[in-house]
């Protein structure tokens, strides 16, 4: 935990540059905006960030993939472990894409699932936990963040799985049994609505029964101001990508 610039400087002596600073409190509006410190020149920005709340300073880990896992548990101890999915940042698409399945060595995927089960069972959680992992090119797995509840990235389950992560979480909280999970497609790519052509999205919404559409209007916003994701499903990631290109749903 760091609460002052002096704490940051002291920690940097041990972990070195680059490193990144992130908030510990979920209620802060910019909680997901981590600050990367490359040199002492970034101390001023670090000071501004710390002024808003307690932070954690961590070493920068060069990772090959950001892999997320959502696990749901009810009070009976039943578990529903969703398949790991990859979060991808691309210069061609604004925002974060979610891709399923993620290519992982069998041992790496087994360890990710084991850690997810261990955390949920150790905490005796009733509800949903979403864990972000950093996976290096050598197959080393680091836990990057743990959040109670389904993250936005879990929206891909609305079109790709027989039971969405959100519905499973509600079932767990109200004490209902958790059914078996069945993938509805071999692959899926979830695209943030902000990166898409709204007119083309509405066209596909009227035509498609095989895609998922997680569209909602935030409270207090203009009725036409939608947010969410479009989940493109297919036989493979390449097939999903081809559909994205053919339907021309990406903004130019």
Label each region the model flagged.
Residues 68-70, 130-134:
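Short, surface-exposed charged micro-motifs
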Residues 80, 141-145:
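Protein kinase-like catalytic core scaffold
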Residues 1-68, 72-122, 234, 238-248:
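Active-site nucleotide/adenylate-binding loops and adjacent lid/helix of ATP-dependent enzymes
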Residues 171-252:
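Peripheral (often C-terminal) accessory segments that flank ATP-dependent C-N-forming ligase machineries
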Residues 111-131, 147-195:
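Active-site "cap" helix and flanking loop/linker of ATP-utilizing ligase/carboxylase catalytic domains
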Residues 18-20, 54-58, 130, 179-180, ...:
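A short linear hydrophobic-aromatic micro-motif
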Residues 136-138:
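Activation-loop N-terminal segment of eukaryotic-like protein kinases
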């Amino acid at each position: 935990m760091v609460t002052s610039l002096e704490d940051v400087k002291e920690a940097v002596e041990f972990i070195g540059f680059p490193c990144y600073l992130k908030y510990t409190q979920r209620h802060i509006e910019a909680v997901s905006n981590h600050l990367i410190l490359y040199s002492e020149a970034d101390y001023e920005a670090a000071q501004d960030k710390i002024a808003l709340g307690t932070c954690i300073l961590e070493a920068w880990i060069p990772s090959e993939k950001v892999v997320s896992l959502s696990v749901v548990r009810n009070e009976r101890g039943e578990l529903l472990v969703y398949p790991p999915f990859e979060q991808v940042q691309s210069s061609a698409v604004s925002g974060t894409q979610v891709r399923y399945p993620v290519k992982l060595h069998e041992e790496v995927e087994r360890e990710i699932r084991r850690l997810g089960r261990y955390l949920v069972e150790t905490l005796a959680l009733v509800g949903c936990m979403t864990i972000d992992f950093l996976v290096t090119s050598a197959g080393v797995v680091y836990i990057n963040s743990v959040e109670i509840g389904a993250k936005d990235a879990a929206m891909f389950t609305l079109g790709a799985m027989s039971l969405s992560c959100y519905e499973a979480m509600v079932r767990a909280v109200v004490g209902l049994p958790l059914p078996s999970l069945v993938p509805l497609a071999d692959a899926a790519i979830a695209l943030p609505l902000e990166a898409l052509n709204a007119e083309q999205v509405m066209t596909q919404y009227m035509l498609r029964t095989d895609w998922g559409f997680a569209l909602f209007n935030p409270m207090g916003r203009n009725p036409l101001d939608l947010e969410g994701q479009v989940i493109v499903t297919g036989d493979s990631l390449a097939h999903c990508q081809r559909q994205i290109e053919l339907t021309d749903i990406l903004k130019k």
